[in-house]
């Protein structure tokens, strides 16, 4: 391995065998376990200076992800409250359906008027301007008790929320929806569930797991009890999917109100760059970001005024959330984004719009009403670019109108118009996981066809010949009515050139996919190395000095050492147009989006076969003497270089 430079890619290849999970597991005992450590909200926050003990705490918590869910504990008091709230919602909808079925139009109309009146009465407007002063930093309070903000600042006066009246509730009978609503109840203790066991499988050997399979397990955890195959066959890129649970603690380890306050204190976040303050009132969407650092008094001041808070790239500050994203990116083979949204009661932060991502809305705290609409035009289905804001008058009937409570998940495809409003007595904290942005066939063709054209032009003189002199006089919109023979002949000639020279070969497609995979390597989050993996990688290596002052490393490779890639998608082997061979990887990427230039190693072409074998062998180990290189010294050299860059892991620790 010669040159080490900064510049991005990795789509794995190989046999992805089903492995046991190192990340997701709750053991087979359905009773809630007693953890050996105490984990507070602050333990779940990312800190550049965490010591090994804290890192181990976080790792242990991640492996116990299912032990605090429906599958391990059964309904709690808060679960019963959430279930009661859902029952009330259901009864309200049944009543509305009965009104419609009985043709009781007057009664149904009265219910709608009462709903609008209640919402309007609670949507009081503050006339004073937004301020960063301490006089506006209090939480929303009712009769002196904090209702929306768990961080009560008693020394400050109460503030009233700016709110946006939500659209009137539609009769469910009038909503023709293709949405499948899955309502989930927590499994009872002692109930043997094969799916639950599959998700809860633990292993004492995480260094032998398959990272793609681990990603599938996290997807399974998010959408449980829906099977992943069923989800991708009937919902993915097709229609929305709602999973409702009775366990409000299902996602509590990802983030909390208190964690956000700690993030604001511990990290230097800037408005606009890291955090947005938004509001949607009277049909107008505004971003109220001041300049400078987003300090807690300023942020909570905006929140107490009824503004929504959006934390961008939340995985950079939350270790547990980053673990989820790094595992998911192995499954989806693309960047996994995570934004956090905090909305006070009776408020709306964003206008109706659609996005260019597949969205998983994870409700962590509180409740929020979501309204989804079909894409306005056929061209907006599976949109490649996010839309602007829509007026309420531009929207048709919603395909779904449901309230998400803590523990619920809502998936919808890109191009789905959506808006969300909090209820009068409930704040909302949710995370949106975004995947598959710019991952369409169109993106592949945008990369592929310029490459194909360039190669064809270099090979064929026919494409380099000049256009006929009369081309501008017979072709163009103004000349469509000119049905002369020379016009038709020129059109046919262009079509023949395209058919003959611009059909991509298999090699062309491989090259284009490699270029797209480079982009993933640049955007991906760096992997989180588990403790059992650390002792098998360069991250656990230590060096010292002998009596003469010479550096002594605590590792040494030989032909019998067994190695494999750290992750299935940890690197991408790319042959560049100039013929150079590079290994792009994301081991050293920053936590912020594309913080650094892409990382790569440039290698000799004859060494590429060794890397290809490591890719195809994953998730299995192979000995260094199996690498297809001529000499033993060259085999050890290649393996050592890859290991020292954090790309390989040994089967056994050196110590």
Swiss-Prot record:
Subcellular location(s) per record: Nucleus
Q: Which intervals carry biased composition (Basic and acidic residues)?
A: 87-96, 194-210
Q: What is its EC number?
A: 1.14.11.-, 1.14.11.27
> Key word NAD present in the record?
no
Entry annotated with the keyword DNA-binding: no
Q: Where is the composition biased (Low complexity)?
A: 76-86
GO MF annotations, alphabetized: 2-oxoglutarate-dependent dioxygenase activity; histone H3K36 demethylase activity; histone H3K36me/H3K36me2 demethylase activity; histone H3K4me/H3K4me2/H3K4me3 demethylase activity; iron ion binding
Q: Name one GO biological process term.
A: negative regulation of DNA-templated transcription
Q: Pfam families per the record? A: JmjC_2, RIOX1_C_WH
Question: Where in this chain does the record put each JmjC domain?
Answer: 307-452
Q: Where is this region: Disordered?
A: 1-48, 67-122, 185-210
> What exactly does this protein do?
Oxygenase that can act as both a histone lysine demethylase and a ribosomal histidine hydroxylase. Specifically demethylates 'Lys-4' (H3K4me) and 'Lys-36' (H3K36me) of histone H3, thereby playing a central role in histone code.
Put simply, this protein is called Bifunctional lysine-specific demethylase and histidyl-hydroxylase NO66
**Naturally occurring in which organism (per UniProt):** Drosophila sechellia
